[in-house]
Regions:
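Hydrophobic (often cysteine-bearing) scaffold residues that line and stabilize catalytic clefts
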Residues: 47, 113, 137
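The feature captures the catalytic groove of carbohydrate-active enzymes
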Residues: 37-38, 42, 82-116, 122-126, ...
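Charge-dense, low-complexity intrinsically disordered segments
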Residues: 1-4, 38, 57, 135, ...
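Alpha-helical scaffold segments that form or flank carboxylate-/histidine-based iron centers
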Residues: 47-50, 132-134, 143
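Low-complexity, Ser/Thr/Pro/Gly-enriched N-terminal "stalk/linker" regions
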Residues: 1-43, 64-65, 69, 78-83
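Hydrophobic core segments within long, regular secondary-structure runs in both alpha-
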Residues: 3-11, 15, 60-71, 118, ...
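Alpha-helical support elements that line or immediately flank enzyme active sites
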Residues: 47-78
Length: 193
């Protein structure tokens, strides 16, 4: 496959999976690329970070919109959830097939994913030179990384504590089976993805 065909394939997937609208639950506009229209129709933290970087080659404005939408969900304490249910009507079906940690608010998860958002913001800023984007992002990022330091580094060793496998980006890894009480499933030859 040549580069032009690869770029066209990426463009088709990214723009087909673009979700835009206004959330019924908070009246906020959203614009993001979902990982899958059928299986994963919501906004995921690190997927959005990678989508924003990929979108730099296709649509720089959408690249910024992707991260703005993600950062708009940051809580006052700095926490940024790994999953945002902008379209709540799709949530019941998804939750019937998936386990998502939720505490309190049903519109987002109570867990996080690898904190790569600063890297994504930097890449988008360097590609666009958009000072307003950078200025708006910095307070959100500072608050998020302070939250990580204050809440997710209980022993002050500079390492973030992982509460469940998705937070490390190693979803469904067998290395967590014992800790999660799934030892009976470990050697059944089942591949879960």
């Amino acid at each position: 496959m040549d580069r032009a065909a690869l770029e066209e394939g990426a463009r088709k997937i990214l723009l087909t999976n673009l979700r835009q609208g206004v959330a019924d639950w908070n009246g906020q506009a959203y614009s993001f690329v979902c990982p899958s229209l059928t299986g994963y129709p919501f906004q995921w933290f690190w997927d959005s970070c990678f989508h924003a970087i990929a979108l730099l080659h296709l649509d720089k404005e959408q690249s910024k919109a992707e991260l703005r939408t993600l950062m708009s969900a940051a809580l006052p304490n700095g926490f940024m959830p790994h999953l945002l249910f902008w379209e709540m009507e799709k949530q019941p079906d998804f939750l019937s097939r998936n386990i998502v940690g939720q505490a309190g608010d049903p519109h987002y998860s109570s867990t996080m994913q690898p904190p790569i958002i600063a890297y994504a913001v930097e890449r988008v800023y360097r590609a666009t030179g958009d000072e307003e984007f950078r200025k708006a992002a910095l307070p959100v990022l500072v608050n998020f990384y302070r939250w990580l330091r204050d809440v997710r580094d209980p022993d002050n060793d500079g390492l973030i504590a992982v509460i469940q496998p998705e937070e490390a980006g190693t979803d469904c890894s067998p290395k967590y089976d014992e800790a999660l009480g799934l030892t009976e499933m470990s050697n059944r030859g089942v591949l879960a993805a």
